[in-house]
Design a protein with these regions (language model features):
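Feature responds to low-complexity, polar/acidic, surface-exposed segments characteristic
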Residues: 1-10, 15-40, 51-68, 76-100, ...
């Protein structure tokens, strides 16, 4: 149950989408080095509005990816479809940037949360959880 970084998450997502060549390798992120294993994945993620980074100049590829970030990346990669229904998680505010992504993930059967009433958005997402999210979304 190893943790997962933001760089690994976008790489998994990029590969799950067929590893498409990005139109441009240029991003504003100074922490995405040329030749890094995740460079193409990050460029693809930026082009497809999957991520805007942790700031205008950083992606933070080595930072742990949170559950909120993981489902948001996945939701955006799916085209940010409308999320219907009512949020059942006490720890997901309706105004949180990730709220529609969490609702989509629940509706799509990607995740059920960490309990009936919690999603744990700020908890680090484990590699096993991410693989499960990707598998369930592909079904």
């Amino acid at each position: 149950n190893a943790g997962c970084t933001r760089g690994q998450m976008v790489t998994f997502l990029w590969r799950a989408n067929g590893s498409p060549e990005p139109k441009s390798m240029t991003t504003s992120f100074t922490d995405v080095k040329s030749g890094a294993y995740y460079e193409k994945a990050v460029a693809w993620a930026v082009e497809n509005n999957v991520t805007t980074g942790t700031s205008s100049t950083t992606f933070s590829p080595d930072a742990s990816v949170t559950r909120a970030q993981a489902v948001t990346f996945q939701w955006r990669a799916a085209g940010a479809p409308a999320a219907e229904g009512t949020n059942a998680f006490a720890d997901v505010s309706a105004s949180a940037f990730y709220a529609p992504a969490v609702q989509w993930a629940v509706n799509a059967g990607v995740t059920t949360g960490t309990s009936d009433t919690t999603f744990s958005p700020n908890s680090n997402c484990l590699r096993a959880q991410i693989v499960s999210f990707l598998y369930r979304a592909a079904k």
